Amino acid sequence: MKCVPGLCSEVVSVIEDFIRQKVAESGASGVVLGLSGGVDSSTVAYLAVNALGPDRVLGLIMPSSTTPRDDLRHARTVADELGIESETIDIDPIIESLTGLCSHNANELALANLKPRARMVILYYHANSLNRLVAGTGNRTELLLGYFTKYGDGGVDMLPIGGLYKGQVRELAGRLGVPPEIIKKPPTAGLWHGQTDEEELGMKYDLLDELLCLLVDRKLPVEEVASTLSLPPSEVERIASMVKGSEHKLKPPEVPDIWEVMECSH
């Protein structure tokens, strides 16, 4: 029996109501989101248009030299099919400018993280200029694993699909009418040439979803999760360490507790 449940019919209306509520509470005029051409951003775009209408949704397509051509084409397809305003901004000049200002050479991780952080800056520039909120496109699988960049693609105002595992997002995308070629293609963040999420994570999303559901939602011990999924305990431990090690990404910056000391000084 699968741990990750199928989607009930109310999920779409709950998420769309959530988007409408957050926009109304903030007094914003709509949302801005990054369109990567992947299933997550496409799904959020469809939900946002259903919730707010196409005139209140702006899609920013922000490719770099490592963005697959299919992703760029798919992002434009989504914008065209939904009838939303879109803008394409090449982020390579921004990356080159920033790295040129530093006195030391960046390692691969620093360079990879710079791309989503540059995109975050562009998203908020547009959001602030247009009185809109930034709608994030992260899913529950990515959030639990910390598979996102702190203050990059994690820097958003709301996460409409943040409660859904990757497989559930694919299911929802199918219901919403996202093109099948987008749903079925291997997910990639396009951080370097040939990069795919599942190769980097070392596990297929379907299996990751089940593992995380058993480990986090049902709180089963590592040994039981490993037995249930016929995995080596070391693999479950590896994922558990990723979850534990990335908890800081989901929390605000920590502040020292100084009030007791201040009160004692009187």
Curated annotation (Swiss-Prot):
Disulfide bonds: none annotated. It catalyses: deamido-NAD(+) + NH4(+) + ATP = AMP + diphosphate + NAD(+) + H(+). Deamido-NAD(+) binds at residues 117, 150, 157, 248-249. One of its GO terms (cellular component) is cytoplasm. Transmembrane segments: none annotated. Homodimer. This is NH(3)-dependent NAD(+) synthetase. It comes from Methanothermobacter thermautotrophicus (strain ATCC 29096 / DSM 1053 / JCM 10044 / NBRC 100330 / Delta H) (Methanobacterium thermoautotrophicum). The gene is nadE.
